[in-house]
Amino acid sequence: MAIDYSKWDKLELSDDSDIEVHPNVDKKSFIRWRQRDIHEKRAVRKQKMEDIKGAMAMNRRLLSRISEMETVLEKESPSDPYVLLGSFLEAKKSEDMDSAIPGGMSYHHMLMSLLKVIKDAEDTTEEKSMDDSDKCLRRLKSHKERLLKLLEDAQKEYDTLEAESKNYITSEDLHLGFDSTYVQKKEPEKPKKTKTKKETIQVIESLNNPTPPTDFPGAKEQASTGNAPKNPVNENESEDEEGLSLSEDGKKFANIDFGDYSSSEEFLKEHLNILADEEESDAILLEAFNAELEGKPSLAKQYVHQALLISYCRQLGPNGLSIFFQKIKDPNHQSQRLFLEDVHNTYVRIHERSAAISKEQAESGEGVEQIQLCAVDPNTKLSITIPEAGSTDPETQKARAAFESFPPNLQKALMTNDLDKINVVLGKMAVENAEEVVEKLSSTGMLSIEEGIIDTTKGETIPQLS
């Protein structure tokens, strides 16, 4: 097969050109001279083409205005055409004040000069028998024809120069054939939620050392949980679970119906950040586990289905999304059967584990987490002060409003100032509500601490309000 070298025909000169030069002339110097000559001629040609384009644009605009002047004369046929055309050009002055060439005459001045040339021109033999209007019209048409001829010649010269510039390849002719770039904008990372650890401290009172250490946190009062965790391993597991936070996009994806693969595919393509976060599928599986514990098996299975979709698509990568969903949408394809089997097996494991946890909790009799009030220092005592009703003091009014916002049974317990009765009521309340009650008691001053002075002669503690 013959090799086609025609694509190199447009190379005007190259460093390895087979050029025969005089023996006294260095070939490299000759090639450099030829290159400089080519670039100079190319620059001159380019500038000439720009000048021709500018002249053509100027002549087209002048031609347009001369045609308007012709139309005005043909319609009016005045006795003094130059006054009429002068008025017409003055009316168009604001439009024609820009210059065709930077630093040159404006279009208005060029047209006024043309009108003066037409007026001062000597009459020809044919024009002697014409009136002024016909003379002016004839001379305008003559200038119009001259401009048309100039435009035609300029266009031919421009086409010749353009064809000459395309005879050889230049750097200006090089351009990108096609380019396809896809940039996936990474969504800003959402700040991770700080894990809140609930610290449970067990205080063992000793007869030999009744005074707690001075650096014990909350040395004056403590709101702690009533039941300490019995299994430290379970506590670590709960902390890991609390660290998994489901993003807003993850929540929306998890709530897509089971088997709605079209919506799932579209959502994942628009939110590729879900695939980038490896904890997203684990967080959805945790939601499935919680739903199963709450007795919502359908919702739990849906969450498992969506979590495994994320897991599969993350392994395939963004380019494999379309292929994966194309196969999984086909009920006769093996991929759908294998995927649904994986969903079923994962759900069964979650179901069995949640059932085992429920059974363990029932058998161990673990109570609900409670908030209790207790004094850490044995020499101190917690005391409740009920604010007076109808007081004019703003702080007392604020405390009274907080007291009246409590449930009636809690108000009765607080009025007894008996810590055991108060703790019974707090133990029956939800943890969040009980914490809010303790916060209000402390902030309004209803909860105070009584410090005692030990009378060594009688072995009694003398209460003293702090």
UniProtKB/Swiss-Prot annotation:
GO molecular function per UniProt: heat shock protein binding; protein kinase binding; protein-folding chaperone binding; unfolded protein binding
Transmembrane segments: none
InterPro entries: Cdc37, Cdc37_C, Cdc37_Hsp90-bd, Cdc37_Hsp90-bd_sf, Cdc37_N_dom
Phosphoserine PTM sites in chain numbering: 238
Main subcellular location of this protein, as a coarse class: nucleus
Keywords linked to the UniProt accession: Cell cycle, Cell division, Chaperone, Cytoplasm, Nucleus, Phosphoprotein
Disulfide topology: none
Cell location: Nucleus; Cytoplasm
UniProt entry tagged with the keyword Membrane: no
SUPFAM superfamilies: Hsp90 co-chaperone CDC37
Phosphoprotein as UniProt keyword: yes
Superkingdom of origin organism: Eukaryota
GO biological process, one term: cell division
Residue stretches in coiled coil: none
Annotated SMART domains: CDC37_C (SM01069), CDC37_M (SM01070), CDC37_N (SM01071)
Region spans: Disordered: 204-249
Entry-linked Gene3D superfamilies: Cdc37, Hsp90 binding domain
GO cellular component: cytoplasm; cytosol; nucleus
Described purpose of this protein according to its UniProt entry: Co-chaperone that binds to numerous kinases and promotes their interaction with the Hsp90 complex, resulting in stabilization and promotion of their activity.
Subunit (UniProt): Forms a complex with Hsp90. Interacts with sty1.
Family: Belongs to the CDC37 family.
Name assigned to this protein: Hsp90 co-chaperone Cdc37
Organism encoding this protein: Schizosaccharomyces pombe (strain 972 / ATCC 24843)
Originating gene: cdc37
